[in-house]
Amino acid sequence: MEYHELNPLIRGRELELISKDTFEQMIQTDSIDSLGEILQSTIYQPYIYDGFDKDFEANLSQERSKLFQWLKESAPEPEIVWIYTMRYTFHNLKVLTKAEITGQNLDHLYIHDGFYSLEVLKDAIHTQVSVELPDSLMDYIREVHEYCEESTILQGIDVIYDRCFLTEQRRLGEQLGYPELLEEIIAFIDLTNITTTARGILQHRSAGFMTTVISSSGSIPKDTLLSFVRGEMASFTQFLLTTDYSELLKQVIHEEQIDLVSLEQLKDDYLSSFYQVAQTQAFGPLPLLAFLNAKEVESKNLRLLIIGKRNHFSLEQLKERMRQVYDL
């Protein structure tokens, strides 16, 4: 199937997305039951029953798996889908590597990414060999394996895989050759590096540790970011206001300090805005990616609402945590 054939099908699936107005109605509800009544009129209707909130996370995962599988089978370039679902691949690598090292069974933490099964990943981690995984993934697995032979600190597994994830995003983005997609990937890496650097400054992390966690795949030079890690936050925030992200970051910088919680939310909203150009494109992969992103935002917002209603969050608490919804 070519993109000009797939994209009309994507447009049809977009009609299933929960609208801004419906989310606003759900925010205003006063109970889980009232929230469920509104969800009865959405694609999630089969998952609404007495006590639905207890199973909703598992049902969201089931919906996500079906979507990933359909897109992988339908997309002319499955790698486009993996650009988005790769975050789950690397989550699985973290979990299953820790299981291999500690001898624990962590299979229940596996998240289907549409590409690599639990068995394939476990076997690759155990044997260091795979005919099904890309060479780049095997290189990352071996790098982590070498680390684990020298260290028992499990946090290092997360650190290495997080950096490898960003490297793989950039590599695949360049390989696919879509300028708008590569721009989004680089912005994602830059904003991740900015968040990581700010957190490192606050936690007084060593230069050695920060060298390991900051990616060199963004547009802001790694050495530039590293130059701030032993300094004051004020110097870093002043620098940020000279970058291409200054207008965005002004919203989360106050009195030379950076609000990291708000930055994470702002990052999601900013990256979502990249995909809005997909509304005018009949060809290419952007409509597919826009839809995947919209579904991910929808899932995050639904989780927030269910947790919020269960724990009696105020309207203000819910609104300030909600991700931006774009009606595609």
Swiss-Prot record:
InterPro entries associated with the record: ATPase_csu/dsu_sf, ATPase_V0-cplx_csu/dsu, V-ATPase_V0D/AC39_subunit, V-type_ATPase_csu/dsu, V-type_ATPase_csu/dsu_dom_3
Ion transport found in the keyword field: yes
Keyword terms of this UniProt record: Ion transport, Sodium, Sodium transport, Transport
UniProt superkingdom: Bacteria
Ribonucleoprotein listed as a keyword: no
MF annotations from Gene Ontology: proton-transporting ATPase activity, rotational mechanism
Coiled-coil region(s): none
GO biological process: sodium ion transport
Function: Involved in ATP-driven sodium extrusion.
Family of the protein in this entry: Belongs to the V-ATPase V0D/AC39 subunit family.
Identification of the protein by name: V-type sodium ATPase subunit C
